[in-house]
Amino acid sequence: MSTLSGRRAVITGGAAGIGAAIARSFAAEGAHVVIADRDAAAAESLATELGGESWEVDLLAVASLESLSLEADILVNNAGIQRVAPIESYEPEMWRRIHTLMLEAPFLLIRAALPGMYERGFGRILNLSSVHGLRASAFKSAYVAAKHGLEGLSKVTALEGAPHGVTSNCINPGYVRTALVEAQIADQAKTHGIPEADVLEKVMLTEAAVKRLVEPEEVASLATWLAGPHAGMVTGTSYVMDGGWSAR
């Protein structure tokens, strides 16, 4: 029997990158996947491919999430954005946007999913954090602050959910081969005053012992285990997948 057979999994930012890799891995293990994304066409395409369903949702429109009731055995909070800039020139609106998407929206989705999870006596909440949830890098104040907040939210969820069979964990990758990371390269080059071709070696991977990007499928493999039946005693923790960055 597949490890996620009969489970309903909602994955935000699920139409591409890490989210899509997780959706494919979950579906391969028997889960019914709900691809939640603002890109309706991409979400529908992947949902059709995997025999799941799509959910067009703008997670920045948080007012619509406040009264939401979310049916999910597994919730993956994955949607995210990035902005690289020094604090003194960081746009306040972008700061708020990042925190709304990456901290307030996960809180509201967890809030919406917990009643059903509690009723069924089972739930898996996976929060796609980052090594930046545990460490800091210059020029990423909003992202680092939001991820640190997500770490705290995940731990509180673990404590409250434990009596009801609900676990909550963070996954903390380093730089993953996604469009989000690729889009940072130009910003990093400008901020650090170096050519784009030098960004990976001189900025992104300087602290990592393993000098390569994390592949989305590697993150998905860990997520699939955490969502499954063998991880019931794993909760309130953060799984680092950063090639040794945080070992320093």
Predicted features along the sequence, with ranges:
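Short, small/polar-rich loop/turn modules that mediate ligand/substrate recognition or access, typified
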Residues: A162, T167, V234-G236
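C-terminal substrate-recognition "lid" of short-chain dehydrogenase/reductases
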Residues: L114, V210-M241, S246
